[in-house]
Amino acid sequence: MQSDIEICRNTPLSSIATVAANAGLLPHELDTHGKHKAKVHPQCLERLTDNQDGKLVLVTAITPTPLGEGKTVTTIGLSQGLSKINQSVMACIRQPSMGPVFGVKGGAAGGGYSQVAPMDELNLHLTGDIHAVTAAHNLASAALDARLYHEQREGYDAFEARTSLRALKIDVERITWKRVMDHNDRALRMVKIGLNEEGKNINGFEREEGFDISAASELMAILALANDLKDLRQRIGRIVVAYDLNGNPVTTEDLQVAGAMAVTLKETIAPTLMQTLEGVPTLIHAGPFANIAHGNSSIIADQIALKLSSYVVTEAGFGSDMGFEKACNIKALAADRAPDCVVIVATLRGLKANSGHYDLRPGMAIPDSIFNPDQAALEAGFENLKWHINNVHKYGIPAVVAINQFPQDSGQELAELKALIERFNPEVKVAVSTVFAQGGEGAIELAQHVVETCEQGAQFRPLYTKKQSLKEKLMAVCEVGYGASNIEMSELAKQQLAHFEKLGFDDLAVCIAKTPLSITTDSAIKGAPSGFAVPIRELRLCAGAGFVYALSGNVMTMPGLPDKPTFMNLDLDDQGNIIGLS
């Protein structure tokens, strides 16, 4: 079989103008970027306001192996399958970060015959939104350090007299805004900035600093959660970057940099339109990770797609304990729109990995032995799929299971897995998906199940209400959402929690950063554990995004590269074609 990029390169694509017209967009509602990409003006929603909303289908997964179980390929393949059965459909996905593209997982365009195309343009830069987020974020960092430098150098009274600005009196020990970049670079997790030659201070105020990956930026979450440009601007102004010497928040509005940040992000408010290999219109917008952010594409993209099509297929990062939980408790409440149906992607290898019989770690190749028939491992790992089915049902949303088939899979084991699901819950429809090898044809049964399941109707119920305290919200996610027995907060986290509530931020949602490789915070614990503790070491305030960010276990907000990163496979041929991208 051809590689992903070869399949993409050998598939004829429609012009983006044709794709847009087929979706129901007008020429003046687009800004084209070459032959196959266009920015879609959110103002098109004014014209479409009377259109009935379509059905929202969210794709999640079991607890994945480090290489993933195929959510994106299923999202794209299902959209093509729905098109095959004559349904009006669009897909909405996140913009890939170059960190994973060059790191472990590779690209995020789908794969095989279920891809967003051109896949190289999607995976590398796209229309520059992530770079704009990075620039706007680091502008706030530069403004913060400049203000700190001038106030410290001159003294507060002299600074106020000279500039007519209020001295912010920033507490250098309580700066919370790190810098960001769109690469995996562990060496930047802890750095010192503002270093000077002896006797000089021209380079700023020396302090400890760190970098996060751009996907973890609060601005990325804001872009994904904003309902329009006005909302984006207001959220940017609420960002807290530090605290003053009295413990009061210092915001981007206080630094008078919020407007310039919004200007930098002006073009990012528009989703990027592309197409699948079978011509299904696809909106790409925002790229927050699900392990260290809220893990869903934008509300604006969903709004546009729901007005243009009968079905919108989107995905949430990692397993249902991760991106799906945040889709329900953060995104759905911000959008006032919950999914009508959830597709849970499962694989034989993923379930066997959850049996505890295999030791799969990031950077390791999947062993061939995992594809050998192993009933004991399959049945033990099936507990994880049961957990995820029950988890989706906690939110009152009906579920469909898509078994993503690999070429090495045993037909007998696929039949056994279908039987296990049917015995566990006969109301949960299940289909074997072969979208990687067959495109939309491989998702026709899945598409039919999704249409039928959407008609059941959802009775959506999030895990907590806005009025509950921050601690109650954390406990709801950990105990009800994960099955933990309790949370264990560090002294630092307890102090931060009390401070946030004192400042009036207890009405915010909560976003827990944890490993995606286990339902717990320990990646070595597989299956469907219960009764465990969730250690929370630190809280971060994301007042603009609208949530408090809890760091659990040893999760890092700046990933590192493995010993054999995927960038080693990338190159250009003599004609300038990219090779090795997957």
From Swiss-Prot:
Keyword terms, alphabetized: ATP-binding, Ligase, Nucleotide-binding, One-carbon metabolism
Protein's name in the database: Formate--tetrahydrofolate ligase
Catalytic class of the enzyme: ligase
Family under the similarity heading: Belongs to the formate--tetrahydrofolate ligase family.
Source organism superkingdom: Bacteria
GO molecular function: ATP binding; formate-tetrahydrofolate ligase activity
Keyword Coiled coil part of the UniProt annotation: no
Ranges in coiled-coil conformation: none
Sites where the protein binds ATP: T65, P66, L67, G68, E69, G70, K71, T72
GO biological process: one example: tetrahydrofolate interconversion
Pathway in which this enzyme or protein is active: One-carbon metabolism; tetrahydrofolate interconversion
Reactions the enzyme catalyzes: (6S)-5,6,7,8-tetrahydrofolate + formate + ATP = (6R)-10-formyltetrahydrofolate + ADP + phosphate
HAMAP family (UniProt xref): FTHFS (MF_01543)
EC assignment: 6.3.4.3
SUPFAM superfamilies tied to this protein: P-loop containing nucleoside triphosphate hydrolases
PROSITE patterns recorded: FTHFS_1 (PS00721), FTHFS_2 (PS00722)
